[in-house]
């Protein structure tokens, strides 16, 4: 979680060029309704000849979450906005109980950046991804807005650690 938007842009450009050499012409994103995010992605990727595909675009947040909850995928919260869900949500499994616990005004999918997840199991996985949640930590970022002002955003992160399946036991959101 180090760096800034310029670092992100450079990393994304490198990744795009890597995938283009493998014949990739489209990137698929799970955005639902944030026009500024979609515009950013299009501006970032169209110069590289990459088409943006948004299969969830325009669906209701409730429909998307209900589809997810019955899909068989398993995810865990790994990032939250510090002034929103905070550290307490780190490590929580996305399930009906989690969704019911969200404060009023929080998008059930975290579409406004309230939270981000790591998907570790589901119907397309041969086996669950073995991992452990290490200690949570906080990080702040200064982001330059379109009007030139700088705003500080603070987040909580899980220290997500891969487990060696040959020597480490467990799969899923085990915590230290």
Which residues does each predicted region cover?
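Nucleotide-activated chemistry modules centered on ATP-dependent adenylation/adenylyltransferase
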Residues: 1-176
């Amino acid at each position: 979680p180090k760096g800034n938007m310029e670092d992100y842009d450079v990393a994304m450009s490198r990744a795009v060029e890597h995938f283009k050499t493998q014949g990739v012409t489209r990137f698929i994103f799970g955005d639902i309704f944030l026009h500024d995010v979609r515009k950013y992605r299009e501006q970032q990727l169209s110069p590289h000849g990459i088409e943006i595909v948004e299969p969830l675009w325009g669906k209701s947040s409730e429909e998307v979450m209900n589809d997810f909850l019955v899909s068989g995928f398993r995810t865990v919260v790994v990032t939250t906005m510090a002034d929103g869900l905070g550290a307490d949500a780190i490590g929580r499994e996305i399930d009906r109980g989690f969704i019911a616990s969200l404060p009023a005004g929080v998008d059930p999918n975290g579409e406004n950046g309230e939270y981000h997840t790591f998907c570790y199991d589901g119907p397309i996985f041969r086996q669950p991804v073995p991992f452990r949640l290490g200690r949570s930590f906080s990080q702040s970022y200064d982001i330059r807005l379109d009007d030139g002002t700088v705003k500080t955003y603070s987040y909580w992160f899980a220290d997500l650690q891969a487990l060696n399946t040959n020597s480490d036991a467990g799969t899923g959101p085990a915590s230290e």
